Amino acid sequence: MSRYDDLFARLDTAGEGAFVPFIMLSDPSPEEAFQIISTAIEAGADALELGVPFSDPVADGPTVAESHLRALDGGATVDSALEQIKRVRAAYPEVPIGMLIYGNVPFTRGLDRFYQEFAEAGADSILLPDVPVREGAPFSAAAAAAGIDPIYIAPANASEKTLEGVSAASKGYIYAISRDGVTGTERESSTDGLSAVVDNIKKFDGAPIFLGFGISSPQHVADAIAAGASGAITGSAITKIIASHCEGEHPNPSTIRDMDGLKKDLTEFISAMKAATKKV
């Protein structure tokens, strides 16, 4: 069984959904990012979605885009990301690690090398937010060869053909978005129609569904679980907490001015979000 299979079996027994934080690697530095990731797991995160910094993050709103920039200002590289994943995997051998990486990275490194490197580092899945499922065949093939679960996005208003393709191609989980647009708490998740979004995907008997985009409160998490999702992913709300503790101006590197304060704020937020995954 994969780490995702083990996670879903455990959560089903506990009557819970998954809470998955998105955290940018190297934001604002590799060491500080590792402390943030460790805090998230200790606070109750069930799995991780880790970002690899990129200069043109088209799927991300301003909050997450700024985290890409902070990481790049600090000298972030793909090689550094791989080393950070290895460290997280060594510290947390059972936690599923999903990656969010823009498609230029695998093109630059070569698909087979790219997926093999991330598999060897300890990643379980990779989502390329700018690669739609209709263009995904070569990525899925390279992922399968490396033992990585490919993840595709199920858009909120997708056609049945697209949802069928996403359900067939996604392994580990399906990333369903609760509304169209870019990531961010600037536009909160709409809870209207969440059940329809989930039900439309479930018709095709694919992997468990995680809902994301604009999930920023315990109520959003509870609504996602009530709608039939197996979990919820939160990125921008967590990134805002991190940013509020950063000091430094682009293009200079940033640093966390009060790590203990950041850990406290993250723990409170993530604990509340995880508590909201309890099925009623």
From Swiss-Prot:
Which reaction is catalysed here? (1S,2R)-1-C-(indol-3-yl)glycerol 3-phosphate + L-serine = D-glyceraldehyde 3-phosphate + L-tryptophan + H2O
Q: Which PROSITE patterns match?
A: TRP_SYNTHASE_ALPHA
Q: In the UniProt record, does the keyword Lipid biosynthesis occur?
A: no
Question: Which keywords has UniProt assigned to this entry?
Answer: Amino-acid biosynthesis, Aromatic amino acid biosynthesis, Lyase, Tryptophan biosynthesis
Locate the active site: E49 (proton acceptor), D60 (proton acceptor)
Q: Which InterPro entries match?
A: Aldolase_TIM, RibuloseP-bd_barrel, Trp_synthase_alpha_AS, Trp_synthase_suA
The protein's Enzyme Commission number:
4.2.1.20
Pathway(s): Amino-acid biosynthesis; L-tryptophan biosynthesis; L-tryptophan from chorismate: step 5/5
Gene3D superfamilies the UniProt entry points to: Aldolase class I
Function text: The alpha subunit is responsible for the aldol cleavage of indoleglycerol phosphate to indole and glyceraldehyde 3-phosphate.
Record family assignment: Belongs to the TrpA family.
- Supply the name of the protein: Tryptophan synthase alpha chain
The organism encoding this protein is Corynebacterium glutamicum (strain R)
User: What is the name of the gene encoding this protein?
Assistant: trpA
